[in-house]
């Protein structure tokens, strides 16, 4: 029996919406990365993008466990000498709540061109409203 390999033309991609209210960051990110990658589907093929589109709403209401709110840091470097910036989780939640979820999920996806293509299917919104209603997303309870 030959191994199954999915064809790009035969793949149907669905839209899912996830509410991040009171969800733990890492647990949500790992579940979302599985749906983005398509590992929940029986026709999963590692070298083809078979995953679905994911919309995450209420990103500003995500939580972390333990002391990570004070002790977790996000780093950014401008490329110049001494140009490193260090932000706490609390600061990022106030100013850029969508970047926290995007960064967590991006680290769980493949590195390379396929990972970049998969990452573009993730849409994150800080509050309850989003502009993708025309896609008719199905709500997922994770």
From Swiss-Prot:
The keyword Chaperone does not apply. Keywords: Ribonucleoprotein, Ribosomal protein. The keyword Ribosomal protein applies. GO terms for cellular component: cytosolic large ribosomal subunit. InterPro entries: Ribosomal_uL13 (IPR005822), Ribosomal_uL13_bac-type (IPR005823), Ribosomal_uL13_sf (IPR036899). One of its GO terms (molecular function) is structural constituent of ribosome. One of its GO terms (biological process) is negative regulation of translation. This protein is one of the early assembly proteins of the 50S ribosomal subunit, although it is not seen to bind rRNA by itself. It is important during the early stages of 50S assembly. Belongs to the universal ribosomal protein uL13 family. PANTHER family: LARGE RIBOSOMAL SUBUNIT PROTEIN UL13M (PTHR11545:SF2), RIBOSOMAL PROTEIN L13 (PTHR11545). Part of the 50S ribosomal subunit. HAMAP family: Ribosomal_uL13. This is Large ribosomal subunit protein uL13. It comes from Buchnera aphidicola subsp. Cinara cedri (strain Cc). The gene is rplM.
């Amino acid at each position: 029996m030959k191994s199954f390999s999915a064809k790009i033309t035969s793949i149907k991609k669905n839209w899912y919406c996830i509410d991040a209210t009171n969800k733990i960051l890492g647990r949500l990110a790992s579940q979302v990365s599985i749906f983005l990658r398509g590992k929940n589907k029986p026709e999963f093929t590692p070298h083809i993008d078979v995953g679905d589109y994911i919309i995450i709403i209420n990103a500003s209401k995500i939580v972390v466990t333990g002391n990570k709110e004070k002790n977790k840091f996000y780093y950014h470097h401008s490329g110049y000498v001494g140009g490193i910036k260090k932000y706490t989780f609390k600061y990022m939640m106030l100013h850029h709540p969508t970047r926290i979820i995007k960064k967590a999920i991006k680290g769980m996806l493949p590195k390379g061109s396929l990972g970049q293509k998969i990452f573009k299917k993730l849409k994150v919104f800080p509050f309850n409203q989003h502009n993708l209603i025309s896609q008719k997303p199905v709500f997922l309870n994770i």
